[in-house]
Amino acid sequence: MASTDTYNPTRDDFAAMLDESFAGGNLQESSVIKGKVVAIEKDMAVIDVGLKTEGRVPLREFAGPGRDNEIKVGDTVEVFLDRIENALGEAVLSRDKARREESWGKLEKAFQNNEKVFGVIFNQVKGGFTVDLDGAVAFLPRSQVDIRPIRDVAPLMNNSQPFQILKMDRRRGNIVVSRRTVLEETRAEQRQELVQNLEEGQVIDGVVKNITDYGAFVDLGGIDGLLHVTDIAWRRVNHPTEVLTIGQTVKVKIIKINHETHRISLGMKQLLDDPWQGIEAKYPLNARFTGRVTNITDYGAFVELEPGIEGLIHVSEMSWTKKNMHPGKIVSTSQEVEVQVLEVDSVKRRISLGLKQTMRNPWEVFVEKHPVGSTVEGEVKNKTEFGLFLGLDGDVDGMVHLSDLDWKLPGEQVIDNFKKGDMVKAVVLDVDVEKERISLGVKQLEGDPFAEPGDVKKGAVVTCEVLDVKESGIDVQIVGTDFNTFIKRSELARDRNDQRSDRFAVGEKVDARVIQFDKKARKVQVSIKALEVAEEKEAIAQYGSSDSGATLGDILGTALKQRDK
């Protein structure tokens, strides 16, 4: 049988209660009032609030997460008066509503003053959790539970802890709180305190907490510092995992502290001597050293000369002849190579190295083996609009310009006689070692007809062979020479009626007089007309005079007979 606690009032108590009863007429529904526990029956508390009848409140309404729920007869409690009297003649009371009203007032004040409030997480709902704020129920979004996502929230349940109110609407009864904001604020305060105890230049032990592509975060005992990948070692570190592992204890030096953002920059290499000190003396210009290839890029290869000291071989300094080849096809990672120091910049911490400088310049070697004027043979590697490129000894190329293909024919015409892969002989005309150029000539394999023209000179009479007959004139070659020229129609005869190209046939030989021989312009011109005019003048001078009475025909006839004899 369930026990029942009963409160037996004294005569004075009855008098006081009678006074309160008369005062009960001033009580209003939907307000918070005080009452006294007069009995506890099973799971109900009987409360006298000074009305005609007592009200009953479930004991569970006095319980709650994080609260002592034991009440006893004689306790004074605050309850919410829902109705003065129900159908059974009893006062309708609620402890929950009283607490909620009281709590909302406190919460609104805390919200306005941006103060923390205490509550208990007691249930999980969609998207988050419900929190009891001393009678008022608030919503805690999952994203506001902690600074980082957590899987197990059980340890956080049913424990009184601080929260920050993010927003609240009393009319709708909505309250949203955050535990994360409180943690962040607490952490910021802790960070501030920790930062105050740290100094730039201080050496401290830490634990590697996280590793990224750009560095590692090190826990310094409640506050993290960033160890950038460039500050791990003096040598090149492509990724922090080459040196560090999560959980590893490392000794670091505090490089910089930003007291506003609480960011701390750390360094490991700063604990060691700077290998770049006195670098110019260690690696003088043009000196040669052996190093190891550590990294290859599109623009060159990095070579480690000693721990912490690397230099770059630019792609342009890798080979004398392999101009457009990727560095990875010339050297390989970890390969030992001999390099020459080209430039040292201690301020920017850069060393420029050369690989090709450790080998002889192939153009110097070529000119030693093949001086200007010597004959070489090479394979046609390319044909362009301005000449031929021949592959020569020493993996160098030489160019035959169009103008150096033939003495007589235009280069644009002659170049069609060559194709890729042909082996061609040529004369070395010039070697420019600095510009890495070799000039060759094919026509120079034969003598220059203008250099040794023989009897061909201006005014000389020459015999020509007809090569081609055209309406505008005839193409001829001076017999016994390499001179080809064109006799235009006006120069075919002295008499206008005889200036016809159809008078001549291919293979026919004709005499003509040289009227132009220009070595500089490389031009020779002959004329049959000029020869006839000269012969006419000579005949008149030799066989006739102005007063002889002989006709021009008689004089020429006599001259021709004399020549034939």
UniProtKB/Swiss-Prot annotation:
SMART domains: S1. Keywords: Repeat, Ribonucleoprotein, Ribosomal protein, RNA-binding. InterPro entries: NA-bd_OB-fold (IPR012340), Ribos_protein_bS1-like (IPR050437), Ribosomal_bS1 (IPR000110), Ribosomal_protein_S1-like (IPR035104), S1_domain (IPR003029). It holds the Pfam family S1. The initiator methionine may be removed. One of its GO terms (cellular component) is cytosolic small ribosomal subunit. Residues 30-96, 114-180, 201-269, 286-356, 373-443, 454-529 form the S1 motif domain. One of its GO terms (biological process) is translation. The keyword Oxidoreductase does not apply. GO terms for molecular function: mRNA binding; structural constituent of ribosome. The keyword Ribosomal protein applies. Binds mRNA; thus facilitating recognition of the initiation point. It is needed to translate mRNA with a short Shine-Dalgarno (SD) purine-rich sequence. Belongs to the bacterial ribosomal protein bS1 family. This is Small ribosomal subunit protein bS1. It comes from Rhodopseudomonas palustris (strain ATCC BAA-98 / CGA009).
